[in-house]
């Protein structure tokens, strides 16, 4: 059903990465927020970041009827919007990790750091929306002379951790030791 198109896009990909999975411990209402976050953020990636960026959604869904329905909805979104890549974590396109299903799901959004075709990667949360302010900060980071390899954002007084899981990015074109893989 859903095809992994990431490898066919070629080198120098710019990716905004998200994780989507079913967690039985999460109340249905919160799951709906994550589902709404897919289409909402896809629209914002297209509108705010533009055609040069792709939204990657790393997913693993319950094999039951609810998961199959979600998968059909994801496939419909991907067929309707070429900026969405669906990445099933049980069938990734090769080394160093072909099956990430045993990896903690919130870490799946970091998988583009292992993809040699990705030159810029941003990690985001599905339950928050991309903003024009964030896009401006990313553009400033990418446009800075001698640009830093990693970019971290904190946009709230309670964001006190050095790196927030859904508010950072990395790039591989800075000439540093990790130039090929992020």
Residue ranges and their predicted role:
Residues 19, 57, 166-168, 182:
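Charged, low-complexity surface segments at secondary-structure and domain boundaries
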Residues 1-96:
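N-terminal anchoring/stem segment of glycosyltransferases
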């Amino acid at each position: 059903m859903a095809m992994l198109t990431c490898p066919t896009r070629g080198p120098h990909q710019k990716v905004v990465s998200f994780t989507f999975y079913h967690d039985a411990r999460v109340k249905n209402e919160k799951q709906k927020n994550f589902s709404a976050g897919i289409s909402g953020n896809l629209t914002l990636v297209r509108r705010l970041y533009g055609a040069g960026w792709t939204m990657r959604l790393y997913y693993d869904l319950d094999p039951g009827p609810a998961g199959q329905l979600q998968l059909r909805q994801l496939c419909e979104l991907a067929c309707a919007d070429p900026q969405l890549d669906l990445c099933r974590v049980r069938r990734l396109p090769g080394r160093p990790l072909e099956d990430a299903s045993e990896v903690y799901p919130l870490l799946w959004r970091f998988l583009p750091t292992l993809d040699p075709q990705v030159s810029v990667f941003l990690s985001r949360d599905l339950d928050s929306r991309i903003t024009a302010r964030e896009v401006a900060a990313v553009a400033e980071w990418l446009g800075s002379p001698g640009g830093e390899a990693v970019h971290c954002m904190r946009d709230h007084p309670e964001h006190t951790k050095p790196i927030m899981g859904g508010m950072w990015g990395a790039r591989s074109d800075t000439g540093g030791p990790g130039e090929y893989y992020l």
